[in-house]
Amino acid sequence: MIGRLHGIIIEKSPPEILLDVGGVGYELQLPMTCFYELPAVGQEATIITHFVVREDAQLLYGFNTRQERTLFRELLKANGVGPKLALAIMSGMSANQFVSCVEREDVSSLVKLPGVGKKTAERLIVEMKDRLKGWISHDLFTPYTDAAPVDHEPSLAPADTVESEAVAALLALGYKPQQASLVVSKVIKPEMTVENVIREALRSML
């Protein structure tokens, strides 16, 4: 089991990064809410991980805090929720926002997430409400304290590259091609980074 990785980010392709750890490159997928907080390419990062083994693949999912990973694992326990849907849910809203939606039984907000219909939203609330009780009040979602201070400032890419990468990220999270292209075209502005475009796109759909 791989529980934590510390290395240098050598590639970013939302929602995936390539992390160099002692000369070995690890591919990790992160919720966009975690991706936004990553340092720039070329800098060190500490990633809390969840390892998934399937018949056809071995996958690593990354998080900034152990508590975010705990929420991911709690989502996986819910009926009908796999890693891809859990990743999409945690990309569409922060951990605190999701817990708040569950506590308030806010079906209307949950159904705006990709892959979450009314029945899935209702099931998530029923299955997770007791397990998540008190998470926000205990302030569990705090940054991983072992991580060194980092520069989060990303470098700007050409506008067409930013747009295509933002659309690709939304597709990877489960959004439909037409929806992804439309929302990105609406929110993109000059000088925006890929992460900024994705953040605004996801925010506009909630």
UniProtKB/Swiss-Prot annotation:
<dbReference type="InterPro" id="IPR012340">
    <property type="entry name" value="NA-bd_OB-fold"/>
</dbReference>
<comment type="function">
    <text>The RuvA-RuvB-RuvC complex processes Holliday junction (HJ) DNA during genetic recombination and DNA repair, while the RuvA-RuvB complex plays an important role in the rescue of blocked DNA replication forks via replication fork reversal (RFR). RuvA specifically binds to HJ cruciform DNA, conferring on it an open structure. The RuvB hexamer acts as an ATP-dependent pump, pulling dsDNA into and through the RuvAB complex. HJ branch migration allows RuvC to scan DNA until it finds its consensus sequence, where it cleaves and resolves the cruciform DNA.</text>
</comment>
<dbReference type="InterPro" id="IPR010994">
    <property type="entry name" value="RuvA_2-like"/>
</dbReference>
<dbReference type="GO" id="GO:0009378">
    <property type="term" value="F:four-way junction helicase activity"/>
</dbReference>
<keyword id="KW-0233">DNA recombination</keyword>
<dbReference type="GO" id="GO:0005524">
    <property type="term" value="F:ATP binding"/>
</dbReference>
<dbReference type="GO" id="GO:0009379">
    <property type="term" value="C:Holliday junction helicase complex"/>
</dbReference>
<keyword id="KW-0963">Cytoplasm</keyword>
<comment type="similarity">
    <text>Belongs to the RuvA family.</text>
</comment>
<dbReference type="Pfam" id="PF07499">
    <property type="entry name" value="RuvA_C"/>
</dbReference>
<dbReference type="Pfam" id="PF01330">
    <property type="entry name" value="RuvA_N"/>
</dbReference>
<dbReference type="InterPro" id="IPR003583">
    <property type="entry name" value="Hlx-hairpin-Hlx_DNA-bd_motif"/>
</dbReference>
<dbReference type="InterPro" id="IPR000085">
    <property type="entry name" value="RuvA"/>
</dbReference>
<dbReference type="GO" id="GO:0006281">
    <property type="term" value="P:DNA repair"/>
</dbReference>
<dbReference type="Pfam" id="PF14520">
    <property type="entry name" value="HHH_5"/>
</dbReference>
<keyword id="KW-0227">DNA damage</keyword>
<dbReference type="GO" id="GO:0000400">
    <property type="term" value="F:four-way junction DNA binding"/>
</dbReference>
<dbReference type="InterPro" id="IPR011114">
    <property type="entry name" value="RuvA_C"/>
</dbReference>
<keyword id="KW-0234">DNA repair</keyword>
<dbReference type="GO" id="GO:0048476">
    <property type="term" value="C:Holliday junction resolvase complex"/>
</dbReference>
<dbReference type="InterPro" id="IPR036267">
    <property type="entry name" value="RuvA_C_sf"/>
</dbReference>
<feature type="region of interest" description="Domain I">
    <location>
        <begin position="1"/>
        <end position="64"/>
    </location>
</feature>
<keyword id="KW-0238">DNA-binding</keyword>
<comment type="subunit">
    <text>Homotetramer. Forms an RuvA(8)-RuvB(12)-Holliday junction (HJ) complex. HJ DNA is sandwiched between 2 RuvA tetramers; dsDNA enters through RuvA and exits via RuvB. An RuvB hexamer assembles on each DNA strand where it exits the tetramer. Each RuvB hexamer is contacted by two RuvA subunits (via domain III) on 2 adjacent RuvB subunits; this complex drives branch migration. In the full resolvosome a probable DNA-RuvA(4)-RuvB(12)-RuvC(2) complex forms which resolves the HJ.</text>
</comment>
<feature type="region of interest" description="Domain III">
    <location>
        <begin position="158"/>
        <end position="206"/>
    </location>
</feature>
<dbReference type="GO" id="GO:0005737">
    <property type="term" value="C:cytoplasm"/>
</dbReference>
<dbReference type="InterPro" id="IPR013849">
    <property type="entry name" value="DNA_helicase_Holl-junc_RuvA_I"/>
</dbReference>
<feature type="region of interest" description="Domain II">
    <location>
        <begin position="65"/>
        <end position="143"/>
    </location>
</feature>
<feature type="region of interest" description="Flexible linker">
    <location>
        <begin position="144"/>
        <end position="157"/>
    </location>
</feature>
<dbReference type="GO" id="GO:0006310">
    <property type="term" value="P:DNA recombination"/>
</dbReference>
<protein>
    <recommendedName>
        <fullName>Holliday junction branch migration complex subunit RuvA</fullName>
    </recommendedName>
</protein>
